[in-house]
Amino acid sequence: MPPNFFQKPETALKRAHELISVGKEMDALETLHDTIKSKRHKQWTKTHEAIMLKHMELCVSLRRPHMAKDALFQYKTLTQQVAIKSLETVIQRFLELAQQKTEEAQKTSIEKVEEIDDLDQADAPENLLLSAVSGDAAQDRMDRTVLSPWLRFLWDSYRNCLDLLRNTAVVEQLYHRIARQSFEFCAKYQRRTEFRKLCDNLRLHLTQIQKHQHLAHVVKLTSAESLTLMQDTRLIQLDTAIQMELWQEAYRSAEDVHGMMQLSKDKDERMVKPASYVNYYDKLALVFWKAGNRLFHAAALLQKYIIYKDMKKTFSMEEAMDQATRVLLATLAIPDGADNPSDLTRHLDIEEQHIANMRLLSNLLRLPVAPTRAGILKEITRLNLPDVAVESARTLYRLLECNFAPLRLASQIQAELTKVTELNRAEYNQYVEALKGVTATKIIKQISVIYDTLSIGRIQKVIPFYNGDELERFLVDIAKHRYVKARIDHRGGSIHFGAADAALSGFFDLEVSDGFGGEAEQVAVEDIRNHLQSMYNNLRDAVQVLDYEKIKRAATDDLKRHAEIYLYHKDADYERILLRRKKIESYKETSERQKLEKCQQAQAEANRKEEQRRAEEMRRLEQENIEKEKLRRLAEQEEIDRKVRAEKMKKIQATPIYQAIVKDHGEEAFQNMDPDSVLREQRDRLDEQRREQQARLQQQEKKFDHLIRAYHLQEMVARKAISDNFAVKAPQNHDSYEKRRVENAIKDHENAVAVYERMQKVRKDPDAAAFLESVKKARADDFNKKIRGFGRRNCVMRNENVLKNRHELPKEGAEERMASAREVAEQTRRDEQEKERRAVRESQRPSKREIVENSEMDSDWRKSAQPTQPRTISSKPFGERFVEGERYRESGAVTASEADSGPWVRGNVTGSQRQQDVPIRNIERPAVPSRFSNREQARGEADSTTNWRKGQVAQRDRDQSVGKQPLMEKRGEPSGAQLHDVKAVATPSPADAGPWRRGMIVARDQADSSQRTSAATPTTQPWRPSRLRQADGAPVNGAPSGRILEGSGSNEPSIGKWNRSIQRTGDSHGAQSFRGISQHQQRRGAADDDRNWRQK
């Protein structure tokens, strides 16, 4: 079980040594592994290297490749920036130990087999049975038992190290060194499968290097040193493939070498050394020879000879002779038709694939075109290779390419091949059999030109290379490949040349000259033809001399007969010739005209196609330019993004999140992250911290809730005590306050009376009156002029506003325009009437008001609370009422009369005084014309029914329905009480008294139903908070009295949680009724009082 606590590296190493000393190597390995894998190690020390060396020893001894891989990857992350030499030391030590263990296992396996072989007694029955079943030797079985596990471990070690070091520039040399050791391992132990996998891994690593060239730490393909290392490694890979005779893998390795050479050549042509090319062509020639491709084998040797000659400044004669002889023999060994597609390729109709393969192989040889046998021979002749080669090779070249002696050719070639064999050169002897086949093919082709039929025995004498069966198989093969057209006749024991049937002839034939090969042989054939022609001419001359007379007589008769025939047909022939000439001329004219028309059409079609091609080319170039521009912009954007990401990552390294990520995941994980990933990691960490903080807060909140609840319980006791104390002291405070208020009111009244008396004296003074009159007269003209100007400007602005509003609004009908005009005229008329009414009210205002004698008229619990003057609610729209309020405020306060200075009714109208004698003061102003008259009229009607708050009483009919019976019973009314209409009563009724009416508005009907009064508390009550006074209906800071709780407004509907101002009417007998409130609202209001006791 690995420890779950952190250990220092020195402690872990000491602990591992202790465990090893007691034989617990696995526990020691786990201890060291946990120490290396710990994320708390951020700085490399020398102790870490000692831990890794011991860790590698334990992994090798216990055969734990996966643990070694994990530890090496972690150690690479720890050391790749500071101690890369330490990483190399650990890896080399690890591979050395694995190799030693493998070699020891191999020796152990061999020794065990030798011990078994040395025993005198017979084999055990199980060994005999196993050998009979498997067919393997004892050494093979022992290797599988003892050596195979260590071979597998060593292979895993090489592969893991290569994966660890791939695509990293700082350990590139170590990577290639391990790759070459891997090739040696595969060659030494003949691990063919592992060699293929190793080659595939190296190709995959190269692909990844090409893909990630934009990164900073990767291997750069622009580096000369890197390309040289890769090229040398690929050449060793090719050598190993040839050594292990894996020819398919050798061909793929040759492609890899060619690709690396092309990369090096693109970087610098001088980077690839000529010796590398010589080695490359030598190995490639061997691969082609093993593949049976003699044409490209000879081409590779020729390329090697050319480069070798240019490379060697002092090209010795022996080296030149050796290279030239090999090239010459390889070229002569090329069979006829080697550059043509095979029969299978022709039958499957895949000639294009054959051409593509030829082009690919030519690219491997760095040839612009595919090589041919004739082209190679011309190049050999140009380089004068036959003269440089050995004598036997030069003779073979002359016999095969220059002479025409099919009957003697085989014996001559056999003699020269014997000389070549006597040279005892393996690279020469490999061409002997191929040269025999080429010689036999050439003899058969030459014989087929001269003879039609030849006996099989004669052919066996001419071609001594094969016996009967081999010769017959050879003839069938060359006939199948259509080198010659031959048919074997076993009955007659002969061979017939030439196709017996046209259907048996192939769809193509080689040229006749292909049977002879060179120009010298063609000259020999011409000599034979000239000899036969001269013999024919001589024989013909001898016949003419012997039969001269007979020939002369026959010639004379023929001449006479031809003359007669000519004379007979002369005229007809002449006419026929003339007619034919005319036809020919007509045909020529017609054909020329048609040819001209066709030429013109062809020219027009060519011009059209050329124009179309140019247009397509222009479109293609434009598209390419667009794509290139798009790619350029994309590359620029990617570069900008990369720089921005790099800058962000650089800034992030200065933040605490960098330390947190490195602490948790390591430096390598941070290097592989982008800014978005870092921000996402930071956001996740913040979310985690927020969740932890929220959990702690929730835990504290639970504790805090209990504490607050305890506070509240104690607070309730303290508040009850304060409330009881306040209830005891409230009457005393009220009496003292009332006493001070009465005294202050008396003093204010006395001062006001004194002022009034002084003003009366001034008013009665004739000098003052004369002065006021003179000032009025002096300013009368200016005053009247300003009044008239103001009126004119007002009318003009009003008309302009009406016209402007008319144009802005959608055009309505003519009736609406007329209605607007009428509203303007009506508004003007109302203004005039308002001025007249104001003058009348000023003249009819009483001198003083009656003073309330005592406070017993107020039935409210507040004692001496003053009733306020009722206000008549207007049914006009809100906009008009707002304008009226502005005008009313601008008009100024009314001068207080003597009656206004009383202590109880100052500024108010008493409820007990009837108002029949004096008209109600109306503060209404004429309405301002509105653009939405209909809508505001509806709103005004709604206001007239809901604007009963703030100490106002709504005008309602006396006949409207009253509250229901259960509501009366709930409020303490008798269950059988009858509802009656309210009568005009000047004094308060008994129903108005009682503590349950606290803060409610009381409305009583007067003689006129439009005049009502409302009770209110005094304006000044310092011992009550303003909030409670406002809630109970008392005026605050001059505001009208009324029951207005929090949340209610003057224009809101009369339903809701806080609208508890109710209208109550009663008669003289104490019958009580409630209007406009439901039972549910009463219950909810009572509950609100109970719930909000702390607010009050």
From Swiss-Prot:
Gene Ontology annotations of biological process type: formation of cytoplasmic translation initiation complex; translation reinitiation
Compositionally biased tracts (Polar residues): 865-875, 1008-1023
Domain PCI: 323-502
Main localization, broad class: cytoplasm
Entry keywords, A to Z: Coiled coil, Cytoplasm, Initiation factor, Protein biosynthesis, RNA-binding
Gene Ontology CC: one annotated term: eukaryotic translation initiation factor 3 complex, eIF3e
Composition-biased stretches (Basic and acidic residues): 808-852, 878-890, 933-942, 955-973, 1085-1096
Subunit structure: Component of the eukaryotic translation initiation factor 3 (eIF-3) complex.
PANTHER family referenced in this protein's UniProt entry, alphabetically: EUKARYOTIC TRANSLATION INITIATION FACTOR 3 SUBUNIT A, EUKARYOTIC TRANSLATION INITIATION FACTOR 3, THETA SUBUNIT
Role summary: RNA-binding component of the eukaryotic translation initiation factor 3 (eIF-3) complex, which is involved in protein synthesis of a specialized repertoire of mRNAs and, together with other initiation factors, stimulates binding of mRNA and methionyl-tRNAi to the 40S ribosome. The eIF-3 complex specifically targets and initiates translation of a subset of mRNAs involved in cell proliferation.
Name the UniProt record assigns to this protein: Eukaryotic translation initiation factor 3 subunit A
Species whose genome carries this gene: Brugia malayi
Lineage: Eukaryota, Metazoa, Ecdysozoa, Nematoda, Chromadorea
